[in-house]
Amino acid sequence: MSCCGCCGGCGSSCCKPVCCCVPVCSCSSCGGCKGGCSSCGGCGSCGGCKGGCGSCGGCGSCGGCKGGCGSCGGCGSCGGCKGGCGSCGGCGSCGGCKGGCGSCGGCGSCGGCKGGCSSCGGCGSCGAASPSCVSPAAASPAVQALLLPVQLLQALLLPAQLLLVQLLLSLLLLHDCGSSCCPMSCSLPIYCQREI
């Protein structure tokens, strides 16, 4: 069976029925689509690797999508690794999403690791989201709604606490000084002069 008879992109030894009919794309061997594609849409159906990359090197090897994509959307559905990264290195290897994302949304659904991190290193490894990505500014609205009444209560109780401390201090000074001096002029017990 001939391959790419319309454009001659693949060599005569290639026996795949589906070929990319653009001269800039070529298949190096029959068993796997290797090398990057500049503007032909990437590897169409080579080992399950779908989705093309603009100028980032394409898919490294069929069955294992390696290397990052600049701005082409990354690897579509290569081994469960979904979602592309702008300029953070993309998905390290299909089946194990490694490396952090700057501001592109992180790893979509790679082994349970969901949500992106802005500058904390992204998702370290699939199956465990990095705990350092949680920040107080990124708290959920429900948590913020629960914290607001507590903060208001603390603000209201602060003057009452100060007044109570001042009252207790005055009572202590009055007890120590006796009737020889009033609490206003008797600041410390050492200055009190008791009548003999």
From Swiss-Prot:
Sequence repeats, residue ranges: 14-17, 20-23
Protein family (similarity comment): Belongs to the KRTAP type 5 family.
Keywords: Keratin, Repeat
One GO term describing the cellular component: intermediate filament
Domain of life assignment: Eukaryota
Residues covered by region (2 X 4 AA repeats of C-C-X-P): 14-23
Function: In the hair cortex, hair keratin intermediate filaments are embedded in an interfilamentous matrix, consisting of hair keratin-associated protein (KRTAP), which are essential for the formation of a rigid and resistant hair shaft through their extensive disulfide bond cross-linking with abundant cysteine residues of hair keratins. The matrix proteins include the high-sulfur and high-glycine-tyrosine keratins.
Name of the featured protein: Keratin-associated protein 5-3
Transmembrane spans: none
Quaternary state and interactors: Interacts with hair keratins.
Coiled-coil region: none
